Amino acid sequence: MEGVMGQVEKRPISTIVFIVAMQKEAQPLINRLRLVEEVNTPFPKEVTWIMFKGMYKDLNINIVCPGKDSTLGVESVGTVPASLVTYASILAIQPDLIINAGTAGGFKAKGACISDVYVVSTVAFHDRRIPVPVLDIYGVGMRNTFPTPNLIKELNLKVGRLSTGDSMDMSPHDEESITANDATVKDMEGAAVAYVADIFKVPTILIKGVTDIVDGNRPTSEEFLENLAAVTAKLDESLTKVIDFISGKCLSDL
């Protein structure tokens, strides 16, 4: 198995799938790369998932978003939609690399500022509390992301740990778990994407832009909405540099 994985890591990267929770977060990159919405997606007809695709340099780029909830019409954020689209995308597209990109809250106590863009080193859940031996470890689900030392050095990107939960706010229980996870940023999808990708052994990178300061003095939702447009633009710049760096390289070069 190690020999097969070694061969894969030395083969040029060809197909990338971006998993992005909200189309608003993905739109600047969609526009920049001139990606086209796929009308006949490889997904079940019942789902609201949206797929954009196109060629950029030598890369087959696919951006998949969970789309809007069919009942309420709001963006389908959170771990469940993220897990589903990741699973379906791996089966249908068979990517060489998954990039989960999006916005996140940051912690000023860990040095995070609005518009900072982080490459995630380790990801875990903070709201799956199972106080039973071994199941407690399973609940946290801590995983390392695919190592990208050359990319981080070349692009001078910040690195931090990510904690994932299904709430935008932070309860005292969540805060305790996030502290235990030593997280610099928190989101609502990353650990779920990493969990599914790990099952299929698909290398995964998580890149997050900070829209709000969780341990600041302003309401998270207010700060998120205020900074969303500016931070997605900054995220787009970073993602474009990441794609340019990946182009023509193998996984082992990252």
Curated annotation (Swiss-Prot):
Coiled-coil ranges from the UniProt annotation: none
Active-site annotation: E25 (proton acceptor), D212 (proton donor)
GO molecular function, one term: adenosylhomocysteine nucleosidase activity
Top-level taxon in the UniProt lineage: Eukaryota
Annotated positions of the N-acetylmethionine modification: M1
Activity response to pH changes: Optimum pH is 6.0.
InterPro entries, sorted: MTAN (IPR044580), Nucleoside_phosphorylase_d (IPR000845), Nucleoside_phosphorylase_sf (IPR035994)
Pathway membership: Amino-acid biosynthesis; L-methionine biosynthesis via salvage pathway; S-methyl-5-thio-alpha-D-ribose 1-phosphate from S-methyl-5'-thioadenosine (hydrolase route): step 1/2
Keyword list, A-Z: Acetylation, Amino-acid biosynthesis, Hydrolase, Methionine biosynthesis
Enzyme Commission number: 3.2.2.9
Keyword Acetylation found: yes
Subunit structure: Homodimer.
PANTHER family per the UniProt record, alphabetical: 5'-METHYLTHIOADENOSINE/S-ADENOSYLHOMOCYSTEINE NUCLEOSIDASE 1, 5'-METHYLTHIOADENOSINE_S-ADENOSYLHOMOCYSTEINE NUCLEOSIDASE
Biological role: Enzyme of the methionine cycle that catalyzes the irreversible cleavage of the glycosidic bond in 5'-methylthioadenosine (MTA) and S-adenosylhomocysteine (SAH/AdoHcy) to a lesser extent, to adenine and the corresponding thioribose, 5'-methylthioribose and S-ribosylhomocysteine, respectively. Contributes to the maintenance of AdoMet homeostasis and is required to sustain high rates of ethylene synthesis.
Protein name per UniProt: 5'-methylthioadenosine/S-adenosylhomocysteine nucleosidase
Protein species of origin: Arabidopsis thaliana (Mouse-ear cress)
